Amino acid sequence: RDCLLSRGLGDVYKRQKEHCTKVYAIQQVMERYSPHEYDMIVVFNSDNRVVPNALHLLNNAYYSGCDSIQAHRMTENLTTSTAVLAAAGEEINNNIFRKGHTKLGFSSALLGSGMAFDFEMFHRISPTLEGSDLAKAVEIKLLEENIYTEYMQEIICYSKKQDSAQGYSRERQRWLSAQYNSTFLALRRLPLAFLQGKWDYCNKLFQWLLPSRFLLIACITIAAVIFTILDWTLSFKWYILLLLIIITFLMALPEGEINKRFKHAVWALPILIFASIFSHFGRIFRSTKKNK
């Protein structure tokens, strides 16, 4: 019945704190309300657009028993090759880590926007959220309490992607900052989660240990080239692994406008791969410089 919409939280609270994060902003919002004041909370970014019946569909899912819901986020600005490749990457993630996971009985991965939660439950966990990445902070709390996240592909949430290599690199830097923290968290908690039989939790922690798509492709390609030079008989498995990964990603790419434009934008893929690699080195360099 009653739903609290939260949009552009960082813009609202950025003046109250020098380095405002979504986690801080959402905590400030939730402090204003009592646990039973609303039925649901729906979180969007300030630039998001949704289909007209989005709230109706979310309401139906909520009253069907879903306490945590992730909508289908799609890229709106397919204006450059970089934006098209970023959009293709997000659709691959949607099919593997959201649609694919729910088909296997695991929770959908959260995205940080286009999310809906039971208000009382979210009010309870919001003070305990930590870190700068809202999606990862919420995911870890939900999985600790065995709360399942449903993925609703029919609820389209349009967002804007970086349309230049420089913008993509800056976005990767922010993602890496949260990813490194998640990796160390996964290394600490995965053994205990495995012994406790929390398979949904284990699946998420293992996922956080994996490198990004572009870095994975780059590492396997470099390994294949090195072994080809040193001993070509040892390189076959690397080429087979590279082929299998590429086929997997292509199978996860849906039909539609993104698929059509991807064929013409694939030439920019090496640029994004190098941008991803440089983002990692940039992160390491800044950490080393800061420690000095």
Task: Write out the residue ranges for each language-model feature.
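Long helical/loop segments within the catalytic core of UDP-sugar-dependent glycosyltransferases
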Residues: R15, H19-Y38, N53, L57-G131, ...
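Short beta-strand-to-loop acidic/aromatic patch adjacent to the donor-nucleotide binding site
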Residues: H36-R49
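Catalytic core of nucleotide-sugar-dependent glycosyltransferases
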Residues: E91-N95, S169-L190, C219, A275-R283
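Catalytic donor-sugar/metal-binding loop of nucleotide-sugar-dependent glycosyltransferases
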Residues: E139-Y158
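Membrane-embedded multi-pass helical conduit in multi-pass membrane proteins
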Residues: Q207-S287
